[in-house]
Curated annotation (Swiss-Prot):
Record-linked PROSITE patterns: UPF0054
Lineage start: Bacteria, Bacillati, Actinomycetota, Actinomycetes, Kitasatosporales
GO terms for cellular component: cytoplasm
SUPFAM superfamilies: Metalloproteases ('zincins'), catalytic domain
Entry EC number(s): 3.1.-.-
Protein name: Endoribonuclease YbeY
EC class: hydrolase
Localisation per UniProt entry: Cytoplasm
Function, in words: Single strand-specific metallo-endoribonuclease involved in late-stage 70S ribosome quality control and in maturation of the 3' terminus of the 16S rRNA.
GO molecular function: metalloendopeptidase activity; RNA endonuclease activity; zinc ion binding
Keyword Metal-binding: yes
Keyword DNA damage: no
């Protein structure tokens, strides 16, 4: 799995954890090990520009995903996973920090960035949360992936509750 994490934000983040949880999420979703993903960490000004340009919405947001090859997990266990360019995930640590502090289960900026990384991966794989049933499916997968990764890394306590809506 080729995953690049590029921190352009000026904020210190746990890039290794972002890389690790992205790799874990893609493995859990059975994406081909030769697929490629890029994660870019930006400041609020850059995120706001992207949010306006691509979503026509004001202000910065926490995470944006830009799919390339529209890879999907294999439908069957014996099916060969697809290979290709997943696309880009853009994260904003300043927004993540605020969301982590304001969440019902307060957590760190890095924990929020881990959650948002999984959220971005799921968007790249075609998951969405516009409709209630889609939201339940996506957030259920997101929680299972984050919990699984935390368990494998010996992290205890409750996983961050979803802060993206």
């Amino acid at each position: 799995m080729s995953i690049d994490v590029n921190n352009e934000s000026g904020t210190e983040v746990d890039e290794q954890a972002i890389l690790d949880i992205a790799r874990y999420a893609l493995a859990r979703m059975r994406i081909h090990p030769l697929s490629e993903l890029s994660v870019i960490v930006v400041d609020t000004d850059a995120m706001e520009q992207l949010h306006i340009q691509w979503m026509d919405l004001p202000g910065p947001t926490d995470v944006m995903s830009f799919p390339m090859d529209e890879l999907r997990p294999p439908a069957k266990d014996d099916e060969e996973p697809p290979q290709g360019l997943l696309g880009d995930i853009v994260l904003c640590p300043e927004v993540a920090k605020k969301q982590g502090e304001e969440a019902p289960t307060q957590h760190s900026m890095d924990e929020e960035l881990q959650l948002l990384t999984v959220h971005g991966v799921l968007h790249l794989l075609g998951y969405d949360h516009e409709e209630p049933d889609e939201k339940a499916e996506m957030f259920g997968l997101q929680a299972a992936i984050v919990d699984g990764w935390r368990g494998e890394h010996g992290l205890t306590g409750a996983s961050p509750a979803p802060t993206v809506s």
